[in-house]
UniProtKB/Swiss-Prot annotation:
GO terms for cellular component: cytosol. Catalyzes the transfer of the phosphoribosyl group of 5-phosphorylribose-1-pyrophosphate (PRPP) to anthranilate to yield N-(5'-phosphoribosyl)-anthranilate (PRA). GO terms for molecular function: anthranilate phosphoribosyltransferase activity; magnesium ion binding. This is Anthranilate phosphoribosyltransferase. 5-phospho-alpha-D-ribose 1-diphosphate binds at residues 72, 75-76, 80, 82-85, 99-107, 111. It comes from Methanococcus maripaludis (strain C6 / ATCC BAA-1332). It holds the Pfam family Glycos_transf_3. The lineage of its organism: Archaea, Methanobacteriati, Methanobacteriota, Methanomada group, Methanococci. Mg(2+) 2 binds at residues 216-217.
Amino acid sequence: MLNKIIERENLSFEESYELFNMLLNESEMRIAAYLVALQTKGVTADEIAGFAKAMRDNAVKIDLGEVTDTCGTGGDGSKTINVSTAVSIILSCFTKVAKHGNVSITSKSGSANVYEALGCKIPETPDDAKKSMEKTNFAFLFAPKYHPTLKKIMPVRNELKVKTIFNILGPLANPANPKYQILGVNSAELSENVAIALSKVGGIKKALVVYGNGLDELTPNGTSKITEYDGKFDTYEVTPKDFGLDYSKIRPCESPDESAKRLIDVFSGKINDDRNFILMNAAGALYTSEIASDFLDGVEIAKEAIESGKVLKKLEEIRNV
């Protein structure tokens, strides 16, 4: 199959599923060759879906009921606060959230890094995650614990330090099989393909796949592209004005500790650029989860949760599990 990819021929869903399982038994050199060849060719919806389905089928199983996930693909090389972690905590004030995350590969603050910097403990086992969900409406699913078959592939990804199909796969391979999902991608071209792949993997009722002018988030300082899936596909663009928010700057972030501190500042009611960034993405997640009727409603719901102290209280609950 490597020659086929090098010749820029696309793989079918079935071939992609087979290739994923084959990579688990390949040498690191050949794994790197496949990953770079796929990335150079450009991945299709079928290839993403085939890999994602195989990744889910190889994962440690966990049943948390009907959950939402907020996750980005990473790989945008940005130095921003970890917005998806902030959003997941806000969202858990209203619905069950299974946050599928990992340590950083290309950014300054991966979700697992920031989660621990917030003083939260990553559940060791699926049973621990279930207890966390029962007590707090929130469970952090640390990807390496649920995808042990990828141990051989992770060192290759770390060594390559470039975007690969695995950056895309993480959000599609949540072992809790989320029914609702807001998923950030690292290029505009990916939004439709990832939305199609998500629908093919199965289990999704509603999803937003977002790209924000260089970020795998909705951006507060420009135009964002969204592909929405709710049984049908719709692609459109939004700006902060569609959320009732002013344009704001994206301030760089240099470490998980800094990210955690700035998240807590927002949760504590501080009004700054970070707040707009978080509110915009929280609104997207609340709309995706069918808690908010639209983005404007989502912003108001998120604001109230922060201003009433619900979000800080929720963070404290999660810390104390």
